[in-house]
UniProtKB/Swiss-Prot annotation:
FAD binds at residues 63-64, 82-83, 129, 133, 137-140, 244, 485-486, 514, 525-526. This is (R)-mandelonitrile lyase 2. Involved in cyanogenesis, the release of HCN from injured tissues. Catalyzes the stereospecific addition of HCN to a variety of aldehydes in vitro. Has no oxidase activity. The redox properties of the FAD cofactor appear to be unimportant for catalysis. The gene is MDL2. It comes from the Eukaryota. GO terms for molecular function: flavin adenine dinucleotide binding; mandelonitrile lyase activity; oxidoreductase activity, acting on CH-OH group of donors. It comes from Prunus dulcis. It is an enzyme of class 4 (lyase). It catalyses: (R)-mandelonitrile = benzaldehyde + hydrogen cyanide. Glycans are attached at N145, N162, N379, N419. Monomer. Residues 1-27 form the signal peptide. Its cofactor is FAD. Its EC number is 4.1.2.10.
């Protein structure tokens, strides 16, 4: 056989094997209605017992809390306490169109999107619904940057990490259909040098790719709440409208979390205790988790004492090292209407991550979408090009606005661009956006045939015309900054937690959510946090199994001595 023929056969076999591997790793969900089977074990907190006991009490039914609960329920009794409502109360969260709609709805204290303004003066939001932020976000799904694992302070089992991603993906992650504006965006990224072209991939790699979505191809949202369906319904109970006010501690043997106090929507107090070998696991998110620890007396001693909060354990870094990835952007108003699209195409570089989507016009500003309420609104269809600074290195802190009421959101400050490396990365990212705007792919969307970044009808602050003027770009970055809604930190591994996510100095208390790391794990982090809940759940099951085997071996040894 000729060498050329043999080479061709080997190439075909290689591609075939790669396809099989790819298909096996990325076994994704199929389009379906949002699965509410879990409603059979979900209750309003008013219907829960005033005092109950469980193996595990999970505070927060969000992006990490739901997969964590489902996993632990495979063997143990689990109670999930979620302060928000069921998604069925707000059907608009279940559609792609609902992303903007829910940001537009006034916050009445019950809506799934809770509004807050950081002390930086930037509008922001957090989830207040079962499923957490995974049910109000833009639906972008990606696996984490693999480089974060070695720097995390956690001894990861990478085979288990990958298996856990698949567990999530085969239920709520979809390969998106082709969308016209996303195709234009992909062409522009490649023309602007964001290489290589990865095609469709869930992996975080430098270059341009189509990534996964938690919106299926009918526009139905899928989210963390559906992962509850993978649990053991006989062992799992979910309480909504349950505001956890404090963690209960005992001192024998050693400082130990023994349960929580929570109130239902009528203001009635309830207590949920954990059984022997059980745990309280806080998954209330970057804002809610450090807030609850502080209210429970776990935090900086002098600070807690100044608020007359009894100090249970001095933990100086609770509420510290709070980060938020800045979002800077450009909006263009094309001369002709464009169809609305969700984000499915990503441009990944070392220092910044970028994407674009197209939208219909609106007359009510979506809260947090633009830097402030005074930002101009689009009167026609528009395209939004966003750049996210990786990391970031800048950080702030969280403090209590109320020393007794968990329903009062705390003060947060992120100190955007206080670290000049972040500012430099923003400048580089926005220059890349300038290169995108200068591509042939985007010429049809100009209103005038002008060179470079000129010729577009820009909504809001325009990019500097001179791509070499770093000072002008720095000013642009500071003046146009908004939140990417990817805030994180406040209860870091290595500062507050050990490598198994246990709060150091306290038995039977863990934290599993976005408060645990000082950097964003990917361009869009929900994939990592969904994985994290399942991963830690499996690790806990393994710990319990190993402990039980050790006890059994001890009993066998004792019995053999007697005999």
């Amino acid at each position: 056989m000729e060498k050329s023929t043999m080479s061709a056969i080997l190439l075909v076999l290689y591609i075939f094997v790669l396809h099989l591997q790819y298909s096996e790793v990325h076994s994704l969900a199929t389009t379906s209605d949002h699965d509410f089977s879990y409603l059979s074990f979900a209750y309003d907190a008013t219907d829960l017992e005033l005092e109950g006991s469980y193996d595990y009490v999970i505070v927060g039914g969000g992006t990490s809390g739901c997969p964590l609960a489902a996993t632990l329920s495979e063997k143990y009794k689990v109670l999930v306490l979620e302060r928000g409502s069921l998604p069925t109360a707000y059907p608009n969260v279940l559609t792609a169109d609902g992303f903007v709609y829910n940001l537009q709805q006034e916050d009445d204290g019950k809506t799934p999107v809770e509004r807050f303004v950081s002390e930086d003066g930037i509008d922001n939001v957090r989830g207040r619904v079962l499923g957490g932020t995974s049910i109000i976000n833009a639906g972008v799904y990606a696996r984490a940057n693999t480089s974060i694992y070695s720097a995390s302070g956690v001894d990861w089992d990478m085979d288990l990490v990958n298996q856990t991603y698949e567990w999530v993906e085969d239920t709520i992650v979809y390969k998106p259909n082709s969308q016209s504006w996303q195709s234009v965006t992909k062409t522009a990224f490649l023309e602007a040098g964001v290489h290589p072209n990865h095609g469709f991939s869930l992996d975080h790699e430098e270059g341009t790719r189509i990534t996964g979505s938690t919106f299926d191809n009918k526009g139905t949202r899928h989210a963390a709440d559906e992962l509850l369906n993978k649990g053991n319904s006989n062992n799992l109970r979910v309480g909504v409208h349950a505001s956890v006010e404090k963690i209960i501690f005992s001192n024998a043997p050693g400082l130990t979390a023994t349960g929580v106090i929570y109130r239902d929507s009528n203001g009635t107090p309830h207590q949920a205790f954990v059984r022997s070998k059980g745990e309280v696991i806080v998954s209330a998110g970057t804002i809610g988790t450090p807030q609850l620890l502080l209210l429970s007396g776990v935090g900086p001693e002098s600070y807690l004492s100044s608020l007359n909060i009894p100090v249970v354990l001095s933990h100086p870094y609770v509420g510290q090292f709070l980060h938020d990835n800045p979002r800077n952007f450009i909006n263009i108003l094309p001369p002709n209407p464009i169809e609305p699209t969700i984000v499915t195409v990503l441009g990944i570089s070392n220092d910044f991550y970028q994407c674009s989507f197209s939208s219909l016009p609106f007359t009510t500003p979506p809260f947090g979408f633009f830097p402030s309420a005074s930002y101009p609104l689009p009167n026609s269809t528009f395209a939004h090009f966003a750049s996210k600074v990786a990391g970031p290195l800048s950080y702030g802190s969280l403090t209590l606005k109320s020393s007794s009421n968990v329903r009062v959101s705390p003060n947060v400050k992120f100190n955007y661009y206080s670290n000049l490396t972040d500012l430099s990365h923003c400048v580089s990212g926005m220059k890349k956006i300038g290169e995108l705007l200068s591509t042939d792919a985007l010429k049809p969307y100009k209103v005038e045939d002008l060179p470079g970044v000129e010729g577009f009808n820009i909504l809001g602050i325009p990019l500097p015309k001179d791509q070499t003027d770093d000072a002008a770009f720095e000013t642009f970055c500071r003046e146009s900054v908004a939140s990417y809604w990817h805030y994180h930190g406040g209860c870091l591994v290595g500062k507050v937690l050990d490598g198994d996510f246990r709060v150091t100095g306290i038995n039977a208390l863990r934290v599993v959510d976005g408060s645990t790391f000082p950097y964003t794990p990917a361009s869009h982090p929900q994939g990592f946090y969904l994985m994290l809940g399942r991963y830690v759940g499996i690790k806990i099951l393994q710990e319990r199994s190993a402990s039980d085997l050790k006890i059994l071996d001890s009993l066998k040894s004792a019995a053999s001595l007697v005999l």
